Structure formats: structure tokens, C-alpha cells
């Protein structure tokens, strides 16, 4: 009797997706996307996305403008729910739980999956109050607890030594790079499991960019990090895994060094060598 392999009934497209996802089978997976489609009204923006994002690693999304990188990133904490007419088909499993389950507590999801945007967005409050903002929302007001959270979050964000004597001054007086690290401190103060970074260095100068990249490297020992970047050199420097997207589709996903030095797809090679995009 001839025995069929587990993949024998798949078409070639499904087989490629299956193999991409199984490449990370030996890793501890934080986010599993088994097959995701997203629509804005009648227009489809993401097409059958399937990938596994490993725990406590840095995964970068690269691709030309409008390819769906940020759209996919915003699915991981359901920020796209805020867009009128947006519809998601499929599942995203965060540590095995589908975050698109009916009745999901989205506020709690966004605590577990924090997000930092490309333009630093500190609140018009003191540095201290920026860091403890999320904790206060959770009803935590004991001064000792807040003080400890401020110190460890700012230290984790490599900002403590620069602001420890200015905690009660306005956060708006910080430089752009300091503001972005403050936003990261504010995000991790509520102890998320995943950090989503949407082009976090695009508005920063090279020195500030280097500090944020060093911070990303330090933070991955505790957090799963997913970063969207237009800067391929940055993706190569900071990430363990890279996904290349084009026109709403996942073209290639794998180990960063391999993807940049020996891509499996010609489309990927053309993009990273500057032939288009």
C-alpha cells in the first residue's frame, strides 16, 4: 500500500506556506498566523499570510511602501479594528490562543502586545507620568510600586541615566531619540509579552537610531519583537528572522542572514539588491 505524505494533498502554494511555517517548528512560537486575509471594504490588502514568529527573537518585515507590512503588524494587537470597513478572515494565535475569537478582551490584548509607532508620541505629561500611565489605568497607584516601575522601565529602555534627575519635567522637552526610548519604556512598564515596532527609527538621527537598535538587541532577551522597517541595513543588523512582503503577499520568510545573502526567491533578491521597490 502506498502511504501519502502529510503534504501530498496540498497544492504548490499551500506546500510552500507549509514549509515556511515548519522551518520554525523547533523554535518556541509566540505568534502563529496559519492563513490570514484582510480587506478594506471590497479591496483585499493581505493575501493568505502564513508564518510563525518565534518567541524572544527579533523578526523584521521589509518590502516597498504599501506592501502590507504595517497592516500585518497592526493585526497582531487588532489596531486595524479601529479602521472603518476593515475585515479580517483567518486566525492569529498568540501563544496558542486565537486573538480574533469573538468576545476577546482587546484592551488586555493591547497590554500583552505593545506597540511603538514611527513618530515618538509621548503624552504632554511629565516623564514619570508617561511611564506609569498604563499602570494607573490598571488601578495601580501605590507610590512605591510606581517608583520601582519607573526606574526599571527607564533602565530597560536605556534612558534612566539621562533622565533620572528630570523625572518630573515635561517629556516634550526630550530629544526625539529620548522620546522614542521613553515611549518604549512606557510600553514595557505594563509588562507586555510582545513588542510591535512600526518603523521606530524613521524620524530619528543616526546616533538616536543606533541607541534604539542597541535597545532592541537588549530587549529581545525578555520580549518577542516584531519590527517594520524600510531600512534593509537595519533589518540585517537587528533581526533574527526577516519576512519580505510585496503587494500584500508574503514572498519569503526565514533566517535573516540567509534571506539577505542567499534568498530563495528571485523577487526577494531583486528587492534587496535595489532592482525595484
Curated annotation (Swiss-Prot):
Gene Ontology biological process terms from the UniProt entry: phosphate ion transmembrane transport
GO molecular function: ATP binding; ATP hydrolysis activity; ATPase-coupled phosphate ion transmembrane transporter activity
Subcellular locations according to the entry: Cell inner membrane
Enzyme kind, highest EC tier: translocase
GO cellular component, one term: plasma membrane
Domain ABC transporter: from-to ranges: 31-272
InterPro entries: AAA+_ATPase (IPR003593), ABC_transporter-like_ATP-bd (IPR003439), ABC_transporter-like_CS (IPR017871), P-loop_NTPase (IPR027417), PstB-like (IPR005670)
Chief location of this protein within or outside the cell: membrane
Reaction catalysis annotation: phosphate(out) + ATP + H2O = ADP + 2 phosphate(in) + H(+)
Binding site for ATP: 63-70
Enzyme Commission numbers on file: 7.3.2.1
Membrane topology: Peripheral membrane protein
Keyword tags: ATP-binding, Cell inner membrane, Cell membrane, Membrane, Nucleotide-binding, Phosphate transport, Translocase, Transport
PANTHER family in alphabetical order: ABC TRANSPORTER I FAMILY MEMBER 17 (PTHR43423), IRON EXPORT ATP-BINDING PROTEIN FETA-RELATED (PTHR43423:SF12)
Quaternary state and interactors: The complex is composed of two ATP-binding proteins (PstB), two transmembrane proteins (PstC and PstA) and a solute-binding protein (PstS).
Family the entry assigns: Belongs to the ABC transporter superfamily. Phosphate importer (TC 3.A.1.7) family.
Function: Part of the ABC transporter complex PstSACB involved in phosphate import. Responsible for energy coupling to the transport system.
Protein name: Phosphate import ATP-binding protein PstB 2
Organism: Pseudomonas syringae pv. syringae (strain B728a)
Gene that specifies this protein: pstB2
Amino acid at each position: 500500500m502506498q502511504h501519502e505524505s502529510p503534504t501530498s494533498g496540498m497544492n504548490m502554494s499551500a506546500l510552500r506556506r507549509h514549509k515556511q511555517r515548519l522551518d520554525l517548528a523547533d523554535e518556541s512560537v509566540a505568534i502563529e498566523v496559519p492563513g490570514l486575509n484582510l480587506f478594506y471594504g471590497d479591496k483585499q490588502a493581505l493575501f493568505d499570510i502564513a508564518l510563525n514568529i518565534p518567541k524572544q527573537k527579533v523578526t523584521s518585515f521589509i518590502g516597498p511602501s504599501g506592501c502590507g507590512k504595517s497592516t500585518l503588524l497592526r493585526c497582531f494587537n487588532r489596531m486595524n479594528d479601529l479602521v472603518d470597513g476593515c475585515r479580517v478572515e483567518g486566525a492569529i494565535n498568540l501563544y496558542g490562543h486565537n486573538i480574533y475569537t469573538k468576545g476577546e478582551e482587546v484592551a488586555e490584548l493591547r497590554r500583552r502586545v505593545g506597540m511603538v509607532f514611527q513618530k515618538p508620541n509621548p503624552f504632554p505629561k511629565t516623564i514619570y507620568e508617561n511611564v506609569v500611565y498604563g499602570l494607573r489605568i490598571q488601578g495601580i497607584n501605590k507610590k512605591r510600586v510606581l517608583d520601582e516601575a519607573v526606574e526599571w522601565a527607564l533602565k530597560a529602555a536605556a534612558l534612566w541615566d539621562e533622565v533620572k534627575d528630570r523625572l518630573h519635567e515635561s517629556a516634550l522637552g526630550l530629544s526625539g531619540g529620548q522620546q522614542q526610548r521613553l515611549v518604549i519604556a512606557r510600553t514595557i512598564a505594563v509588562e507586555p509579552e510582545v513588542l510591535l515596532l512600526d518603523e521606530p527609527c524613521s524620524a530619528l538621527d543616526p546616533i538616536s537610531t543606533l541607541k534604539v537598535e542597541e535597545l532592541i538587541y537588549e530587549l529581545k532577551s525578555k520580549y518577542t519583537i516584531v519590527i517594520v522597517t524600510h531600512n534593509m541595513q537595519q533589518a540585517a543588523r537587528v533581526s533574527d528572522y526577516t519576512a519580505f512582503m510585496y503587494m500584500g503577499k508574503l514572498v519569503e520568510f526565514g533566517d535573516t542572514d540567509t534571506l539577505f545573502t542567499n534568498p530563495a526567491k528571485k523577487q526577494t533578491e531583486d528587492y534587496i539588491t535595489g532592482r525595484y521597490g
